[in-house]
Amino acid sequence: MQFTPDLLPSDVTGAEIYLQTEKGGQFQFQKGPIFANLVLADEINRAPAKVQSALLEAMEERQVTVAGKTYKMPDLFMVLATENPIEQEGTYPLPEAQLDRFLMHVVITYPDEAVEGEIIKLNRAENAQKPKSHASEPAAVPQQAIFDARAEIDNIFVSDLAQKYMVDLIYATRFPDRYGEPLDKWIQIGASPRGSLALDRCARARAWLDGHDFVTPDHIRSVMHDCLRHRLILSYEAVSQGVNADQVIDKIASLVAAA
């Protein structure tokens, strides 16, 4: 979905349409693009807040309510979103409640020279193959394979010590005064319990990708920036000093010891 300033909530969730049949007129719900396995919300912060909030129920409750009726989302449902820098024209800040519902916030910067050269080569190769048959395209991943992978990740072992380390990291964002300056001057609002859940899920996923059946502090530290950077609200003092969320998380990682 391309998010634009004139987008309406019904363009996302769908709407009831009046149909004339032999038995008379009736309303029928026409599903919107949100009813898909993988939803890409492109430039999400170009749309007004009321459209952004249309995603909230679907992302958290896995359902959409239209005209008093509830419609369930598919079992396999994920939302990816891109956003423009807030200083660009025509952008709206995402509400904290919506940001908190995203599992991770991945920062994508400009590629280095070598990677940009590979991008040019890849694009050139793809353009050269367009007139050819699509027989060589990779097969789609069966949904069951994704469900099986999720089940394996759910079985990754998390020790009490690893869990305590995750909780300590989250509590450091909520009670930075326990760690003194400068941390207590930088954080205005810390991570919610969704931050703890995200850290746990992503650490287990990272352990699974690394071929391990248990979570270590290294797994937790490797995902904590992506899990927490969008959940912290920094103080005016931090912003005025040019301190960003990643620097705050780095400071937390250096102060909170792994058991």
Residue ranges and their predicted role:
Residues 37, 94, 157, 161, ...:
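Alpha-helix N-cap and coil->helix boundary residues
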Residues 22-25, 128-132, 176-185:
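Short helix-coil transition/hinge motifs at the ends and kinks of transmembrane helices
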Residues 1-106, 112, 117:
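Conserved ASCE/P-loop NTPase catalytic core
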Residues 8, 17, 45, 49-52, ...:
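Signal for well-folded cores of large energy- and translation-related assemblies
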Residues 174-259:
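C-terminal engagement/docking regions of AAA+ P-loop ATPases
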Residues 53, 100, 117, 160-167, ...:
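Non-catalytic, well-ordered alpha-helical scaffold segments
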Residues 9, 13, 91-151, 157-168:
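Conserved AAA+ ATPase core "coupling" helix
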Residues 37-41, 84-85, 132, 144-156, ...:
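Short hinge/gating elements
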